[in-house]
Amino acid sequence: MRVSRVRAAQNRERILDVATKLFREHGIDGIGVADLMKSAGLTHGGFYGHFKSKEDLVAQACGRAVTLMRDNWIRTMDHSSAPLETFAKEYLAAKHRDNAGRGCPMAALGSEIARQGAATRHTVTEELKPFIIYLSKIVQGRSARLRRERAIALYASLVGAIVIARVVDDLEFSKETLNAVANAMQNKGMKRNASASRTHAPSAKKRIVSRASRETKV
């Protein structure tokens, strides 16, 4: 029996949801199409009715992962009186370190995405840019250039800390890494830019509210 358009769209969304999680858990090359489709509860043969290739899926799944991450964090910071402190604290939490499948895709897949094709890298870049713009509106700085620089430094420091904390096989060293970055940021007086208003912070380009609300925030 021919699958309806609605069911086909649901299946496609299911594949993307599963891919965003499994790629982060196992790596892009660590999960094949057959296993991915099995995890989605679908047949291998149906894959190419939704995507041109695995590379096509990778580009869309990685872009979606960044979108979900970005929207979750923006929502969290929008509802916090100390958004940067909240962001750093939750990002550097042990539960984020230990839950790559639901965590930041840049920390989980950054080095792999760098080796992907132009489509994947471009999609990730375009989905990440609004998050840097958002952060640049709430960090301190006398100029837009300085605030953007600090926003990039903040995010890059957090990503790097999680990467190292996951790589090392010494739990105390892992904890020390997370604590060191948290303390360094605290010592820099990480505070919200007093002149910035949440009304000035750009909203994410693509809100996937229903799906993002189901994504476990880490």
Located regions from the model:
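N-terminal intrinsically disordered/low-complexity leader segments
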Residues: 1-10, 191-218
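Amphipathic, non-transmembrane alpha-helical scaffold segments
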Residues: 8, 16, 62, 66, ...
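Helix-turn-helix
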Residues: 14, 18-56, 60
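Amphipathic alpha-helical segments that line or abut small-molecule/effector binding pockets
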Residues: 17, 81-96, 152, 175, ...
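Solvent-exposed, amphipathic alpha-helical segments
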Residues: 18-25, 72, 76, 157-164
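Amphipathic alpha-helical linker/stalk segments
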Residues: 61-89
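Helical hydrophobic small-molecule/effector-binding pocket
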Residues: 79-107, 114-122
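Hydrophobic/aromatic-rich alpha-helical bundle segments in the mid-to-C-terminal region
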Residues: 117-126, 139-200, 211-214
